[in-house]
Amino acid sequence: MTSEITNQMASTKLSDASASTLADWKEGLKAPAKDARPQTEDVTATKGLEFEDFFIKRELMMGIFEAGFEKPSPIQEETIPVALTGRDILARAKNGTGKTAAFVIPTLERVNPKISKTQALILVPTRELALQTSQVCKTLGKHLGINVMVSTGGTGLKDDIIRLSDPVHIIVGTPGRILDLAGKGVADLSTCQTFVMDEADKLLSPEFTPVVEQLLGFHPKDRQVMLFSATFPIVVKTFKDKHMNSPYEINLMDELTLRGITQYYAFVEEKQKVHCLNTLFNKLQINQSIIFCNSTNRVELLAKKITELGYSCFYSHARMLQHNRNRVFHDFRNGVCRNLVCSDLLTRGIDIQAVNVVINFDFPKNAETYLHRIGRSGRFGHLGLAINLINWEDRFNLYRIEQELGTEIQPIPQVIEKNLYVYESPENIPRPISSSQRQPGQQQEQDGTVVRNNQGQNPRGNFRGGRGGGGGGQFQGQRRNPPPGQGQPQQGQGMGQVQQPRQNGQQAQRNPQRQPTGPPQA
């Protein structure tokens, strides 16, 4: 069905007169600077369609143009024509290939701003993803006169009730909060024709499935249901058979892991991980990085260690207050800080295009988590680097994840080539417009919200020079197994010791400009 529609659109090209008419509406609109970074085939291998070929509203086209969207990606080419017909869709595509716009554009097109009823509900698993998705809706629909509301847990219910007293056309939120509003009769979903689930594999986990099914009960029976994710476990098939009407299935996953992301591992003892991380910071040319830990306690501890080493760092995890998490996410996305330490809170759908390095300080336990983590780099087909710090206990997970994903994670080489993850003009990376910028070097208290040290950085996000600005550093490749004769390494003590006192009682002094020689041998 999609191929017939898209092929017909591709063959129906506009006349020169029509093309000149279309160009007129662009007058007075300001498109952002073009992103000149190279892209991989999963976003460039299109059928040659333009957004104009979908025959969507002129006002929506204006928002798409001002957002900097040039041509639809493959997932957008496949999804938008079918979604505009109102058919149910089950779409599987890689992280960072344009899934959000694939469902936001047809959703905006089908909403009638003259009807003061909620006409679309977009469910996401996390608060950060809800904020990001709602912003995409507002950006693309800025000329449509559509009201978009984001509603998540962790904020006051009273504020949501007040906002719903005015017309809201699209609600973006997490399942629990939306069910609360619908159950109280505050959110009227009786005329909500579009039901979208992003990161559907997470939303259909045992934690969320009962809530999602209850929410569907508030919708009309002829609603359109669209599910999007990078992975579809068996629970998705069960939901499809029960709640979807002959959905059109789209699968663009010729391989699970993202093209354009180079994956390495370094075998290090637990107590040496911080030193290894310090080496990576000194040797890699990092624009922005996300560092993952497996627990909230380790997130805070590692963030503190990183600031002690003299690097700028934020942290975020699920136990933080929501307004603090929002502030960290907003500032990091706007380039205020180079490094973010977090738990798996930010593995789902978060799109920060400036991130070119992901480091698994703690190796994930399963392939699904690994896939979503490394997908935070290399967004929308750009290049990225994923480095995994592996200890003795992680080796079995490493082998299993390689087998399940059909990929090979290579030992870290002595030299990591810049062309694998570095681009020439970081100042041209698309960033959201920040309403306020902090002054260079500004410190914020370490109150459990953020840990910052902007020393040597441009707070506007143009990270040229300063810490982490070196490139092509020397790394000692690590073996998966310990060297012969050493046996199993001893269990490390926590995260390693930074600035430990010497045996004679004197504090070890560190030269901030010292270049470590490489990760220690396991």
UniProtKB/Swiss-Prot annotation:
Residues 260-420 form the Helicase C-terminal domain. A motif (DEAD box) lies at residues 198-201. Keywords: ATP-binding, Cytoplasm, Helicase, Hydrolase, mRNA processing, mRNA transport, Nucleotide-binding, RNA-binding, Translation regulation, Transport. It is an enzyme of class 3 (hydrolase). Belongs to the DEAD box helicase family. DDX6/DHH1 subfamily. It catalyses: ATP + H2O = ADP + phosphate + H(+). Residues 463-475 have a biased composition (Gly residues). Its main location: cytoplasm. One of its GO terms (cellular component) is cytoplasmic stress granule. ATP-dependent RNA helicase involved in mRNA turnover, and more specifically in mRNA decapping. Is involved in G1/S DNA-damage checkpoint recovery, probably through the regulation of the translational status of a subset of mRNAs. May also have a role in translation and mRNA nuclear export. It is found in: Cytoplasm, P-body. The keyword Cell membrane does not apply. A motif (Q motif) lies at residues 49-77. GO terms for biological process: mRNA processing; mRNA transport; negative regulation of translation; P-body assembly; stress granule assembly. ATP binds at residues 93-100. It comes from Phaeosphaeria nodorum (strain SN15 / ATCC MYA-4574 / FGSC 10173) (Glume blotch fungus). This is ATP-dependent RNA helicase DHH1. CDD domains: DEADc_DDX6, SF2_C_DEAD. Residues 430-446, 453-462, 487-516 have a biased composition (Low complexity). The Q motif is unique to and characteristic of the DEAD box family of RNA helicases and controls ATP binding and hydrolysis. PANTHER family: DEAD-BOX ATP-DEPENDENT RNA HELICASE 50. One of its GO terms (molecular function) is ATP binding. Residues 427-522 are annotated as: Disordered. It comes from the Eukaryota. Residues 80-250 form the Helicase ATP-binding domain. Its EC number is 3.6.4.13.
